Amino acid sequence: MKTKGKAWQLVLTVLLIAAFVYTAFFGVAVKNGYVSTTYVNGAKDIRFGVDIKGGVNVTFVPSDGYDATDDQLEAAQLVIENRLVALNVTDYELYVDNNSDSLILEFPWQSGETEFDPEAAIEEIGTTAYLTFREGSSADGELVLDGSMVESAAAQYGPVNGSSSEYYVALKFTDEGAKAFGDATTRLYQTGGTISIWLDDENVSTASVNAAITDGSAIITSSASNPFTQEDVVKMARQINSGSLPFALTVDSYSTISPSLGENSLSAMVLAGVIAFALIMVLMTALYRLPGFLACIALAGQVAATLAFVSGYFPVFESFTLTLPGIAGIILAIGMGVDANVITAERIKEELRSGKSLDGALKSGFARGLTPIIDGNVTIVIVAIVLMGAFGPSDGFFAKALHFVFFAFGPSTAGTIYAFGYTLLTGVLLNFVFGIFATRIMIRGAAAIKALRDPRLYGADAPGKTPAEKKQVNFVGLRKRFLTFSACLMAAIVLCAVVLGVHLDTEFTGGAMITLSYENSFEMSAVQKTASEALGSNGLTLQTGENVATGEQTLKISMPGTETVTTNEVQTLLDSLNESYPDNSFAQLSLSNVSAAMGTKFLQKSLVAVVFALVLILAYIAYRFKNIGGLTGGMMAVLALLNDLMVVFGTFVLLRAPLDGNFIAAMLTILGYSINDTVVVYDRIRENRGLLGKKASFEELVNHSVNQSARRTIITTVTTVMALGVMCVVSKLYGLDSIFTFAFPLMMGMLSGVYTSLCVSTSAWVAWSERKGAKKN
């Protein structure tokens, strides 16, 4: 028996996953009286984004009445973005108000949170952090170099100059900085001079020059009387890497804000997740029996591991802000996890029904299922890496690797998109661990147990039962209808967009931010309707909060648009609100007309990122499927993908939902999901070409392969759509329209993905091949 001696692997793997799931969700903490010490972070320690748990709103203005130019404000915006990402604050909105020379920042934080100090973060964000090296020990000494000549800074701990170990900052200079530092140290070594290092007006280190330093590096150490702590060097390295502000900033106002998705959004999503996982477990077990049940155990481990990477469960990985787009990345990764298990279970079932023994079916099923799983996951990894490179911090690994693609846009970040890429990449890599490795260990272990060796537990038919003959659908024969329908659908979506109009969020267009104070409680939807009528805009977003300094309750109204809002219009708004709701006593606190947080450059960069990802995917498909004309197949896959993206766009238009960062995340999710569906179909075509050779025409080959892949494609999509469907229902029950307008377009895009992967991409491929063949003849 080939699986003899492996039964213990099933028990051990299940126990390890169960222990990991428990600790990942609940953490490990010891309570001693009233004091609780956390040793391992759990799901409760996840820092959720502003959209889910609320946060703080800060307005920065130049210190001492400094008159900043538009270019300086834009430069300050970039530095603050880099500092936020360095602090692992990836969910933020940062706007510039050029009229009042202010920067308005929102980032997540919850009252009572101890792992993150918002006031310390605000202080660090607003610090100028101008690094200089000067000759001598005074602040007016001759400048040797500044922070712009530093390529990177890293916090280190170890022996310095042969003495005891201490914390220090290791610097690596640019070529220009290395030359300047080498020249200065060579000269000062000969004269016995010193070099002092300054951060703003603070002398952080002064040292005698004992040798010429020409290797392009240096270290910043502390004095013996005031040694650096680990926190000191980490903060200093972070500030140096993020760059210096062009002017000093002062906090003008500071207030808390409520979740933009609603107070109950997190509870709703947890409930939706539990229900969705239960339904997936029932479906997988019903369809695939024992392998389906074991797949759900592995899937639970994958979900827990993804949350562990976000919560800071692993000490080597810092906690990460989880936003709605980040949750979308997890959903997509879960879909990929289900897909890997469905492919494997389907292959095992096929082998059993072809007459193979259980051991033979497992061996063959695992081997034949691995290639499509890898191919599908690689396409998702490509998307995730491009997103992290395009929208992550400029000193990040992927940003440096892809600098040659995005250098024209300058260094810029988009935290929510970066978070999406992070959770997506993490989830897909974990899919290899749980969806492939863990599942296979458990199935092999189960097959080694005598009571679990009945082939029917793995999908085989009962003895003597003849499998029902599967009816072949002539997908390729209907290609003209499919292609015509897709063309008409996209034309209809364009027409709807023209007739109904496309609503862009403040993130893209800029607009006005009106902050009001109020008393007592009110019905949000009613106030939103009144405000919309008073301002003549249907795209308003309302958030409640509290001013930290005064304790006043605040209402922030965001109004997208390119035209400024005047004080007279704000007065009209106040008159309407106070007339309709006299008990609330609305009063104006501030008015800011802001530029777009994600403006033209962001849209251009998004387009380049998508195109670059598609080019890489096309190249991968062309290489992997070169024996069956992979380049043409890749082009047809990209063409079919446009259908899916248009469906997502059209759904947003029909729902009259504003296009914002969540829209970008939804589009990127469908890009990865749909391409994966198509690649799995292509993999079956390649396999059948090897089996059938020239016995079948290309049309017959494609049609046979699509029929074989249809069940897997439909089941995978049903499980993911089921999760999104539950989210839609729960969000409606909880009155969370923002979640619904995110989940529903995703669901429609995935349904479109089934259609295009089975009916459009392959049909277009056959039609192209026929036309190409006709030209040759």
Predicted feature residues:
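A structural signal for conserved, well-ordered secondary-structure elements
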Residues: 1-777
